[in-house]
């Protein structure tokens, strides 16, 4: 059983930033605002059956992640992966920065949507994931479009001399504010920022939850909500986005 994560999308138009929170809520934690639904319910099966398929390679990667890797629920999965591909196909970025590769599922989904000149730089700080993730990225049809880097994006990106059209934040929740600030610095005008897990299993509304990760996500949400360049729209993705 696995759950779809939360996702936020930021779009930069001139000096204006528009932020959308696309979210689904995990069944792992009670939340008074939303009914929890895992991808084992009839409705979830209907959603999957009526969405574009992920393809055999991504399916095998997702299965291998669940068999071989600790905390496999961190992988994006079918529906979020199709959304990422859809957004990339629509936005048409030339350079994508991903912070938090995990096993490469999301990077490969985004790579599917890239044009001929598109390239993804994806960073992962957990070096124990390197062999598994590099094997799956290098074995894919999109290996030439994905630059997989082990290391801290906060330290390496400023040394790269690159600009990005799109940034996907899915790394250490404690560092989300730093990732956001860095993303804005290296994002071209008209670029997009996506941030995953912005509801953090519903913990963001639980006042008793004061752990570093929950606090990091809250700080990010508060920052973008109060940034005068940002408009915030919360959309219940699981209720129906085709």
Predicted segments — roles?
Residues 3, 8, 17-18, 22-166, ...:
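A short alpha-helical cap/connector motif
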